[in-house]
């Protein structure tokens, strides 16, 4: 490996380390905010405040707080020199970490409780940030830093697109190839010998009986139109017997095909799981890529996407869509469509989705992007 390749390799490794450190710090900052909101009424965490919970629980909360605050401070120390390489989303994460750390003292106490610093700063942090921005712009190495940040964002985009294509194409290819060359021949060969490979098919038999009845009526109708004498009983019985055998073979084929679909879907699920497990680092990169894309949208675009998603899955017209989806899945798997199950699913699952979504807006989106929540309320017609 050439010297340039070694340098690029270690540069990419350093970029991934920065991303991982920043992600850990961001999650720790969110944890601290959650503790403040849930237990301290959106105020600072203090050890001298009685929470009305058992002492063991309060001690656990303080331990989690101290560990998260230590991670935030360590993150700031490790990523401060590489601030110029961060994209917009990562800078927002870094600002959240700085905001959390600035609310507390810099030194962790040696005792069991965190010391809360409320001393005024000599200069506002915004002014210090302005001076730091000017210093970075005048730095002779700033151009290299910007280029390194661009390369890291480009690598992040390429990795995200690659893992997205792998997550889509690999399960589909495995499903088609395994179904056509492995599962289908094996099921066709073993289904006559192994009865459990054939579904019980009362629904298919009902459909076959209905088709046979319609076929008999068509024969009688054609006989009345095309000849003066109706079909004899033996001729009618023979034609119906041939049609019954044809319908039976068709029902057996549909039953066997449902078994093939089940095994093909399982192979696709296994392939998807393997890709996810083998590409965990790439999935974290893709998560950051999509976070940046989502946060780059305007408030109106975010609100529009949220309203579109909720109206499709939990809106007024969503029951029809869920009915079509469930019936399609049941047909694909060879299962009879149960109207009671469909109605129960429609009555419960969209409600659960709506509850989760409202909780997400209250606990996460309302803190990260309050303007998006205000725009969402205005577009949705609620106060």
UniProtKB/Swiss-Prot annotation:
The record's subcellular locations are: Cell inner membrane
Keyword terms of this UniProt record = Cell inner membrane, Cell membrane, Hydrogen ion transport, Ion transport, Membrane, Transmembrane, Transmembrane helix, Transport
A Pfam family: CemA
Give TM regions: 163-183, 258-278, 306-326, 341-361
Q: Which family does it belong to?
A: Belongs to the CemA family.
Q: Which PANTHER family match?
A: CHLOROPLAST ENVELOPE MEMBRANE PROTEIN (PTHR33650:SF2), CHLOROPLAST ENVELOPE MEMBRANE PROTEIN-RELATED (PTHR33650)
- The name this protein carries in UniProt is Proton extrusion protein PxcA
- Organism of derivation: Synechococcus sp. (strain CC9902)
